[in-house]
Amino acid sequence: MARFGTQKLYIDGAYVDAGSDATFEAINPATGEVLAHVQRATEADVEKAVESAERGQKVWAAMTAMQRSRILRRAVDILRERNDELAQLETLDTGKSYSETRYVDIVTGADVLEYYAGLVPAIEGEQIPLRESSFVYTRREPLGVTVGIGAWNYPIQIALWKSAPALAAGNAMIFKPSEVTSLTTLKLAEIYTEAGLPNGVFNVLTGSGREVGTWLTEHPRIEKVSFTGGTTTGKKVMASASSSSLKEVTMELGGKSPLIICADADLDKAADIAMMANFYSSGQVCTNGTRVFIPAEMKAAFEAKIAERVARIRVGNPEDENTNFGPLVSFAHMENVLSYIAKGKEEGARVLCGGERLTEGEFAKGAFVAPTVFTDCSDDMTIVKEEIFGPVMSILSYETEEEVIRRANDTEYGLAAGVCTNDITRAHRIIHKLEAGICWINAWGESPAEMPVGGYKQSGVGRENGVSSLAQYTRIKSVQVELGGYNSVF
């Protein structure tokens, strides 16, 4: 018997059975335990969710801005009240350490919802004078029914990042979580209903991207799709969304981000930043700075500092608050990461740390991979070119600033980048030349609600968070008013 039994769909403010008996398993990657049997939505369920969302959206959009704001703020309060419970469930479902989920996942998701709840009354149009007898005014109106498709690494946080601006702007959202980590998104739906969100305004459909995701992206009455995931899948989602009914899209996709350490940098601080940029959340963060560039003359000293820090990582049971590095999200993903590690060895990179699956003692039943650092890497290696989405750092040496900027930009991705230096002029000079949408100077990884996040090149389209994202969930209606006479040419 699974610990959490059978998980149903969430449609029209309540849990409902899917149209078929098909289910998939939610697995604890730390132990292999089956946590739940999750129902698979059918195409008929998608239609029910769309109809429910259309009804609810009309009610939601008709509310005043302050009414919507109060309901979203109430949801924030409930999220914070239930923080520890939700964090524990997220840890079981994702394998992320409780020391992370308790202080980051729900906290930062609630922060984003609170941010947009405060912006609801600020959605305004413009008044544009034409002449004494005529003017134009604009209205920012909600799109209608939108879709969010989440990734498996930050399930509830991503659901909040996508739903917060959508709901704030007066839309409804149908959310499809990753098949790998579906449990906390269903809890979020409960919380929205408890807070007073009209039925249907936030529905959750569980199932595969190939089926449920496609039915949603191709549905003619969906107005926008916001997707987080890999670039290859993102291109398919974007093509499906645009070819079916010219839907608007936001794509937060993959990355292979560079971290450039300059010769004048504080090497201890740079090593700390590199560790966070590679091993936080067991390396499963889209913005990870996995290509670490270090001046050739500093490479040996930097390697020593990294090895010292890797040795301090506390790998273990993610439910233990002393653990700061848990398993990977699934056994299938573990095998994928291990295949990249094997490729790195084959292509001549030197293993500085890790490089294998952990199987002793409590690790035997879980999807644990040792924090891995490769050095003596070159730009043409597979581990340097392709997104691994695991705890694998590649150290590369360089000689000149011009060279490292060119090499940092030599990638199809452009999600994130960072620079470590004590020279403020150099910091901005380099950052301004890097082709990336999210950049840090002497830091890595923080993504506050106020900060727009998204990528260049193959790393995405549009932005999440920040004021600008709210506008992406509205459309402008322009109205000309004539107060004087009207002259016809006929």
UniProtKB/Swiss-Prot annotation:
Q: What are the BP-aspect GO terms?
A: glycine betaine biosynthetic process from choline
Judged by the first EC level, this protein's enzyme class is: oxidoreductase
Q: Which cofactors does the annotated protein need, by name?
A: K(+)
Q: How is the cofactor bound?
A: Binds 2 potassium ions per subunit.
Q: Which UniProt keywords apply?
A: Metal-binding, NAD, NADP, Oxidation, Oxidoreductase, Potassium
Site feature Seems to be a necessary countercharge to the potassium cations: at which residues? E248
Q: Which domain of life is it from?
A: Bacteria
| InterPro entries noted in UniProt | Ald_DH/histidinol_DH (IPR016161), Ald_DH_C (IPR016163), Ald_DH_CS_CYS (IPR016160), Ald_DH_CS_GLU (IPR029510), Ald_DH_N (IPR016162), Aldehyde_DH_dom (IPR015590), BADH (IPR011264)
- Quote the pathway field: Amine and polyamine biosynthesis; betaine biosynthesis via choline pathway; betaine from betaine aldehyde: step 1/1
- Residue ranges of coiled coil: none
Q: Which Gene3D superfamilies match?
A: Aldehyde Dehydrogenase, Chain A, domain 1, Aldehyde Dehydrogenase, Chain A, domain 2
- Note the PROSITE patterns from the entry: ALDEHYDE_DEHYDR_CYS (PS00070), ALDEHYDE_DEHYDR_GLU (PS00687)
* Active site positions, chain numbering: K162 (charge relay system), E252 (proton acceptor), C286 (nucleophile), E464 (charge relay system)
Q: Short name of one Pfam family for this protein?
A: Aldedh
MF terms per GO, please? betaine-aldehyde dehydrogenase (NAD+) activity; metal ion binding
**Modified residue annotations for Cysteine sulfenic acid (-SOH):** C286
Q: Which residues bind K(+) 2?
A: L246, K457, G460
EC number(s) on file: 1.2.1.8
Q: Which reaction does it catalyse?
A: betaine aldehyde + NAD(+) + H2O = glycine betaine + NADH + 2 H(+)
Q: Which residues bind NAD(+)?
A: G150, A151, W152, K176, P177, S178, E179, G230, T231, T232, T233, G254, C286, E387
Q: Which residues bind K(+) 1?
A: I27, D93, V180
Functional description taken from the UniProt entry: Involved in the biosynthesis of the osmoprotectant glycine betaine. Catalyzes the irreversible oxidation of betaine aldehyde to the corresponding acid.
- Which family is this sequence assigned to? Belongs to the aldehyde dehydrogenase family.
The UniProt subunit note reads as follows: Dimer of dimers.
Protein name, as recorded = Betaine aldehyde dehydrogenase
